[in-house]
Amino acid sequence: MKSIVDPSALVIDLGAQKRPTVISVVGAGGKTSLLFWLAELLQASGRRVLITTTTHMFMPTSHWPVVFCRDPAMLPHASLTSPISFCFHSWKANQGKVQGFTPEAIDALVQRPECDVILIEADGSRGMPLKAPDEHEPCIPKSSCCVIAVMGGHTLGAKVSTENVHRWSQFADITGLTPDATLQLSDLVALVRHPQGAFKNVPQGCRRVWFINRFSQCENAIAQSELLQPLQQHDVEAIWLGDIQEHPAIARRFVN
């Protein structure tokens, strides 16, 4: 275990030594903020970063350029050379959201030589801090070399229900919890380890990172021996604990 993590270690966890690097982020609320943080982390090491989605996400408000197109693999060279940029299929003004591309379209985009890193929001959660996937979720490109599953650590010790869990029925099936039950760390571990849980549809050979976000509010609720089960059983390659809105965003990192 290492505290106040060296950013270069996080790059290793992501498998970002190779190019192109395709990272898909799934799970609960906090995915978009994590994507932005990852973009700055990876761009700081000299990589060009493209951010997109296989679902929908709120229209970015950052200063980074945004490109809309039907087929990202056919974009002109200049559209893919910004240090950090966004690329989407369309804009849904009535929802304030952008629509992304199919996983297959992103797999084709990866073949472009301009692409160093593609960051993908590959799941929806309606901003809730916990989420289990439905039958059609998540939408992960086969070219992904790393998948990060996000969960809200501030829910540990709190009551869970449809108010703070997206896809409650699936979540209850995996964890065995009933409405208004108190969430335990073992329930999050079950969500990580279950084949229909947090890492559902992850391509073979893909690195897996479990990120417990907003961890600073629940540090005392973490039993390290229980937390490390997915790592010891090789369900994940790394566990990150932190708060994406704080500095440093990742306060603890566990790897084998």
Swiss-Prot record:
GO BP of this protein: biosynthetic process
InterPro entries documented for this protein: Mur-like_cat_sf, YqeC
Pfam families, alphabetized: YqeC
Gene3D superfamilies: Mur-like, catalytic domain
SUPFAM superfamilies documented for this protein: MurD-like peptide ligases, catalytic domain
GO terms for MF: ATP binding
Protein's name according to its UniProt entry: Uncharacterized protein YqeC
Species annotation: Escherichia coli (strain K12)
Lineage, opening ranks: Bacteria, Pseudomonadati, Pseudomonadota, Gammaproteobacteria, Enterobacterales
